[in-house]
Amino acid sequence: MSFRFNEAVFGDNSFNERIREKLSTALNSPSKKKLDILKSGIKVQKVDFPTIPQLEILDLDIITQPKSLAKGICKISCKDAMLRIQTVIESNLLLINEQDTPSFTMPQLINNGSFTIPITMTFSSIELEAITNIFVKNPGIGISFNDVDLDFKFDCSVKILQSTIERRLKESMHVVFKDVLPSLIFNTSQNWFTNRGESTSTIPGKREHHHQQTTMSRNVILDGSDFQELSPINMLRLSSIVSSRSTLSLHSTVMNSLSAIPGCLERQNLYRFISRMPSLNNYYSSQSFPQPKSSTVSSKQLVKPFYCSHNLLPKTVLDSSQYDLATITKIQSRLFDRSNSNDDNAKPRRRKIKCKKTRTPSNLQSQGEQAVDDSTAIETVTSTPVQTPIPELEEQSPPYLKTTVSIRDKYVIPEKISLNLDSKKDTSKKKPFYFIGLNSQEPSNNWKWGMEDSPPPYH
């Protein structure tokens, strides 16, 4: 489906003048952000359409009830169009950025005045092919450009800026088809569909009236009959959520819960979540030494991170020795499982401490005696009493006799000694024990008391 435009409309210069005025208004709209480099408004000098545009309707959908609305997909083709605009720019970039630049970075210039340059930009041989969605309603026409193919020739009065401006225009051309042209077409269609007898001064009043009609109230989305189909349980939940969030306070409205919304942790309740995490400090502080709960929360608690609580035993628990190693191991294992929940192969690193007591000489002697008593069978043998000779003077003593230093009254001689492996180590460290007595060299005696080199006699 296609149709032709009226050639008389494009042949008359009034159409081009109307397009020029609308385009100038759109480019100088107060809602647009004005660039600092522009020292004046943008003026559209000339608009020309020597070739009549072509419009091909690809799809059309007309809805008469309940609203009069026509939807269509169209293909627009335009050739040999021309556009010329003029403005004034500021060439002194130091003056533009003076307000936003710190004073210590600005050089001390002799003259930092304004230097404006008038510039004229001409777009010629404009060729446009676009696929558009058109919505036709009583107030006007709304159009949106989906697929745009644009080509043009650009000429600038300042040749040194021509390449830079052309590159930036091609990069920002999507803004023209997204915002400028749709608003221009809509405003033109509003003026076109209104009665010719009415003045243009009544158009803003009608636009405000149309805006008031299209403003949606609360009852537009849900009517009174729609509330009967809603679940009362869902409505109760929604009302509780809304009431819990209708506050500007940093503290929670419900002090006994972690969050007013299930599954959502709020910032003001973070310290409660941290206090319930398994740690040595939290466990022993809550069990053995309970602290009074207060409804007020300090600012330090709100911003205090988890690592500041220190996974350590409180000093009072250490002083009173009220800790349990099994409980500590369980808490540390839970902390390890929480931190390595994604890694199944991770194993905790246990610190093993071997407790070894240092052996004193008294302990060594007692352990050696106990080992010998347990591992050896000792038979008590009465020793032969020996009369201790009376020491004489040094001149009267025979040369082959010597007095002993000391003689023990009782000495036990083991007949059979069976040593264990453990007792060998201990007995090797013991000092040797010797029996020292008289050594008789007479041939009449068949025995002699043992010295260091010879053992005592056995009977």
UniProtKB/Swiss-Prot annotation:
It comes from the Eukaryota. Residues 1-190 form the SMP-LTD domain. It is a multi-pass membrane protein. Keywords: Lipid transport, Lipid-binding, Membrane, Mitochondrion, Mitochondrion outer membrane, Transmembrane, Transmembrane beta strand, Transport, Ubl conjugation. GO terms for cellular component: cytoplasm; ERMES complex; mitochondria-associated endoplasmic reticulum membrane contact site; mitochondrial outer membrane; mitochondrion; outer mitochondrial membrane protein complex. Transmembrane segments: none annotated. Residues 348-359 have a biased composition (Basic residues). Residues 338-375 are annotated as: Disordered. GO terms for molecular function: lipid binding. Residues 338-347 have a biased composition (Basic and acidic residues). Ubiquitinated by a SCF (SKP1-CUL1-F-box protein) E3 ubiquitin-protein ligase complex containing the F-box protein MDM30. Ubiquitination is important for mitochondrial integrity. Lacks alpha-helical transmembrane segments, suggesting that it resides in the membrane via beta-sheet conformations similar to those predicted for other outer membrane proteins and porin. Component of the ER-mitochondria encounter structure (ERMES) or MDM complex, composed of MMM1, MDM10, MDM12 and MDM34. Component of the ERMES/MDM complex, which serves as a molecular tether to connect the endoplasmic reticulum (ER) and mitochondria. Components of this complex are involved in the control of mitochondrial shape and protein biogenesis, and function in nonvesicular lipid trafficking between the ER and mitochondria. MDM34 is required for the interaction of the ER-resident membrane protein MMM1 and the outer mitochondrial membrane-resident beta-barrel protein MDM10. PANTHER family: MITOCHONDRIAL DISTRIBUTION AND MORPHOLOGY PROTEIN 34. Belongs to the MDM34 family. Present with 377 molecules/cell in log phase SD medium. This is Mitochondrial distribution and morphology protein 34.
